Amino acid sequence: MDQEQERGISRLWRAFRTVKEMVRDRGYFITQEEIDLSLEDFKVKYCDSMGKPQRKMMSFQSNPTEESIEKFPEMGSLWVEFCDEASVGVKTMKNFVVHITEKNFQTGIFIYQSGITPSANKILPTAAPAVIETFPEASLVVNITHHELVPKHIRLSDAEKKELLKRYRLKESQLPRIQRMDPVALYLGLKRGEVIKIIRKSETSGRYASYRICL
């Protein structure tokens, strides 16, 4: 195996780990063992005898934890798929949408290598009421939420959001905003109208919280 291929596998392994962390951070059940999978074990499990990654084998399902279901009753199961094809066309995306809808997944996460055609992107809304999110592999090699300058973000439930607005006598329009395409919003799968609590460290008071609504 040449150095370039070795580097490619290492990047894919890191992206796989980030996806597992992302799914866990959204409140789905992922074991620490899955996240701690070593590069060598990853190669054994997901590469063929020639050392080529078999992305289809990396796909997985995850269900919400009991704690998450209590907080977000509408939260259903999730399916993550890594695409073998370099460029994603209509047929591949249609197959993915069919899989998500037929198996009644609430969320589908589709991870691609280099690009998705505009025609394939137009198919995504047909999965409704399920939500399909797409991520390029390269965006997942590093987990952005682990950066020391990124504060902790926590998604609020509807009840917590109502309590927040009531406590501070605010309307939704008065809350600071976070764009749906913000990297952390994408990581957490935030939807329009959802509120996140951001916990920052403060030199004077230890920690302080602020809130943003997703638009």
UniProtKB/Swiss-Prot annotation:
GO terms for cellular component: RNA polymerase I complex; RNA polymerase II, core complex; RNA polymerase III complex. InterPro entries: Arch_Rpo5/euc_Rpb5, RNA_pol_Rpb5_N, RNA_pol_Rpb5_N_sf, RNA_pol_subH/Rpb5_C, RNA_pol_subH/Rpb5_CS, RPB5-like_sf. It is found in: Nucleus. Its main location: nucleus. GO terms for molecular function: DNA binding; DNA-directed RNA polymerase activity. Pfam families: RNA_pol_Rpb5_C (PF01191), RNA_pol_Rpb5_N (PF03871). One of its GO terms (biological process) is transcription by RNA polymerase II. Keywords: DNA-directed RNA polymerase, Nucleus, Transcription. Component of the RNA polymerase I (Pol I), RNA polymerase II (Pol II) and RNA polymerase III (Pol III) complexes consisting of at least 14, 12 and 17 subunits, respectively. DNA-dependent RNA polymerase catalyzes the transcription of DNA into RNA using the four ribonucleoside triphosphates as substrates. Common component of RNA polymerases I, II and III which synthesize ribosomal RNA precursors, mRNA precursors and many functional non-coding RNAs, and small RNAs, such as 5S rRNA and tRNAs, respectively. Pol II is the central component of the basal RNA polymerase II transcription machinery. Pols are composed of mobile elements that move relative to each other. Belongs to the archaeal Rpo5/eukaryotic RPB5 RNA polymerase subunit family. This is DNA-directed RNA polymerases I, II, and III subunit RPABC1. The gene is RPB5.
